[in-house]
């Protein structure tokens, strides 16, 4: 296909191996790559924006292959894409990619994900956007994930990818020859236990570390085909998960399922 202008961001920061692998994969396909990402790790920042301090950027071309323009930004992942689209890029990109994240972004955890938030900024600006993650914090081979992301993005653009639809891609942490298939998935509903670890400092004051472990993954009640697997079950079976996500979180069930509205609250008799 023709060369694309691709904006890449992440939440693991400008030095992350997954980021460099993704940028390299895109450039190898002949695409023009620009990177704008946090200057340090800012995982689990969700869709936070920096409002109480200025954003600062610094060129970081030397961290990437020749020909890739790169900036490290003092803000959040969402800040980075917003700033890139508004100020740093000469032209609107054809594609926004966020990742490759060092760890999964599955189920309702995407609401905490800086990786997904960066991609969502592209979606909100009607740019086809994808979040890419390898579902392990320890896995360090990102080459296949980078190739897969570019394959899927190129095909989706050829097939008239709706720009209002974010694609969330999760790759299982295993060798290429052990990966079974790629298919559409639903978001899981993830439940945690022991979310906080309580400790005591030398002065006797309590403090807390957010910890927690997943104890339950429930299938969502979305309106996709009933045979869609959950994203979590897909990864557990060494399959690639691709989940379509819309920024519109509006309720689509029937009115009869909602709590009744009492107009006497507005106009008491």
Swiss-Prot record:
Annotated a divalent metal cation binding sites: 11-12, 43, 101
GO molecular function: 3'-nucleotidase activity; 5'-nucleotidase activity; exopolyphosphatase activity; metal ion binding; nucleotide binding
Cofactor: a divalent metal cation
Subcellular location per the Swiss-Prot or TrEMBL entry: Cytoplasm
Entry note: cofactor: Binds 1 divalent metal cation per subunit.
UniProt xrefs under Pfam families: SurE
UniProt-listed Enzyme Commission number(s): 3.1.3.5
Cited SUPFAM superfamilies: SurE-like
InterPro entries: SurE (IPR030048), SurE-like_Pase/nucleotidase (IPR002828), SurE-like_sf (IPR036523)
Broad class of where this protein is predominantly found: cytoplasm
Gene Ontology CC terms, in alphabetical order: cytoplasm
UniProt catalytic activity: a ribonucleoside 5'-phosphate + H2O = a ribonucleoside + phosphate
Broadest EC class assigned to this enzyme: hydrolase
Alphabetical keyword list: Cytoplasm, Hydrolase, Metal-binding, Nucleotide-binding
Family to which this protein belongs: Belongs to the SurE nucleotidase family.
Function: Nucleotidase that shows phosphatase activity on nucleoside 5'-monophosphates.
Protein name: 5'-nucleotidase SurE
Species of the source: Prochlorococcus marinus (strain MIT 9312)
């Amino acid at each position: 296909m023709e060369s694309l202008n691709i904006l890449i961001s992440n939440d693991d920061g400008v030095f992350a191996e997954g980021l460099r692998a993704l940028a390299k994969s895109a450039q190898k396909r002949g695409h023009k790559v620009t990177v704008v990402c946090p200057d340090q790790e800012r995982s689990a920042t969700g869709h936070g924006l920096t409002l109480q301090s200025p954003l600062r950027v610094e060129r970081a071309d030397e961290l990437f292959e020749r020909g890739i323009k790169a900036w490290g930004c003092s803000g959040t992942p969402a800040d980075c894409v917003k700033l890139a689209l508004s100020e740093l890029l000469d032209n609107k990109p054809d594609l926004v990619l966020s990742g490759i994240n060092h760890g999964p972004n599955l189920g309702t955890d995407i609401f905490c994900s800086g990786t997904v938030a960066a991609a969502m900024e592209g979606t909100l600006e009607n740019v086809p956007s994808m979040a890419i993650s390898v579902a392990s914090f320890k896995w360090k081979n990102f080459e296949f994930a980078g190739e897969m992301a570019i394959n899927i993005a190129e095909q989706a653009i050829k097939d008239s990818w709706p720009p209002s639809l974010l694609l969330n891609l999760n790759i299982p942490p295993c060798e290429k020859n052990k990966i079974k298939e790629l298919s559409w998935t639903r978001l899981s509903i993830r439940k945690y236990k022991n979310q906080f670890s309580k400790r005591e400092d030398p002065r006797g004051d309590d403090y807390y570390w957010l910890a927690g472990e997943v104890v339950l993954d429930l299938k969502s009640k979305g309106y996709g085909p009933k045979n869609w697997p959950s994203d979590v079950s897909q990864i557990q079976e060494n399959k690639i998960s691709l989940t379509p996500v819309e920024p519109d979180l509006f309720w689509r069930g029937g009115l009869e399922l909602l709590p009744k509205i009492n107009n006497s609250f507005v106009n008491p008799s």
